[in-house]
Amino acid sequence: MSETSEQMEETVQSGNEPISKSTWMGFIKNLATFTGDLSTLSAPSFILSGTSLLEYMSYWFEFPELFVTIVDFPTPKERMLAVLKWYITGLSREYASRNKNYGTEKKPLNPILGELFYGSWDSSKGKVELTAEQVSHHGPESAAHVVCKEAGITVDTHNKYRSGFSGRTVYVNQLGQLRVHLEKYNETYYITLPNISLEGLWFMAPYIELYGSTYIVSNTNYITKIDYSGRGYFRGTKNSFKATIFEKNEDPDYIVEGVWTGESKLTIPSLKSTIFFLSIPSLEATPITVKPESEMGDWESRNVWKEVSAALASGNYDIVSSKKSTIEQSQRDMRKKEEAEGAVWARRYFKWEEHDSDARNALAQAVLEVIEPGFWIYIGDTHPSLPAGEQPVKRME
């Protein structure tokens, strides 16, 4: 193809640089011919977001008032409804904010093993604090602990996923959980994570849809089942959901329907009434507050990826590839050194609990589906004398 012909190719804007249709379709071809989990496939620079996947853990908490005021509701039924409202706002930030910011969906950077992310939000009840750590790299797995001590509310979460390509769509199966604990009531809410489909690839405008169902299961016997649907070829509304709240083996108390990036309504079947529930566009998200990058440790996300992020922001993809390759090679070298010395990487804040029977039984019995065993339990700082944001060079489990 001549230079003139190349300049006339259809393009799409990505960051500060237009991407040609042929370049984009080459990327799609790589997806289609790749075998195995897509997390092991190195993505081209033009589709990267410049933000580490570990930092995405914070998106669940960008409406801190909805989070901390869950404890204010007087009955288990109302608290379940409050948990659902917080969860829906988290979906909107976790799975739609990149599309809003960039105009199209972007792939996050894969965190390195041991990567750390800290931050906080102010709320009417006190500070909400987050500690996150990349606890596995192959396959990728992140864990986080979030607490508002004054409100007596904590969240522990971990996320791992499997991904693949079929037809025109990337599918991501999320296998982790969110667990919300309310100290005052000794209540725990076990929450499964939605499966994701990345649509619009053939039109050079990828966006996320959620599909299937997720569950919120409480030890109060209240259950929420959330069904997701999207825009089909001929019908349907993008980002639609229907949530049904019921006590185990009882009729529904509440039904919430709408769009998890837009508005939703609450129906109370016993009263045969429908009222307003939530309007995402009317809410203003509160991004996490972090310390200045100059004060961050070497293992903190924004420090690890700062040169890659800066190059992505300027559209210099050669520098992106070079800096990203340097980080990845350093990690490979570290793993080889550990293997040669018989060392195993130990996590700073979390420990894997294989036989997490209480949660597994609660979820499996309630939703009648297989729940993968185990959970990354927050155990506090195993190296309190070490500055935040740092990891020992070599550690034994």
Swiss-Prot record:
A molecular function GO annotation: oxysterol binding
Highest taxon of the lineage: Eukaryota
GO biological process terms on file: intermembrane lipid transfer; lipid metabolic process; sterol transport
GO cellular component: cytosol; endoplasmic reticulum; membrane
Glycan attachment positions: 186, 195
Pfam families attached to this UniProt entry: Oxysterol_BP (PF01237)
UniProt keyword list: Endoplasmic reticulum, Glycoprotein, Lipid transport, Lipid-binding, Transport
Chief site of localization: endoplasmic reticulum
Annotated localization: Endoplasmic reticulum
PANTHER family associated with the record: OXYSTEROL-BINDING PROTEIN HOMOLOG C354.07C, OXYSTEROL-BINDING PROTEIN-RELATED
Family in the record: Belongs to the OSBP family.
Name this protein carries in UniProt: Oxysterol-binding protein homolog C354.07c
Annotated organism of origin: Schizosaccharomyces pombe (strain 972 / ATCC 24843) (Fission yeast)
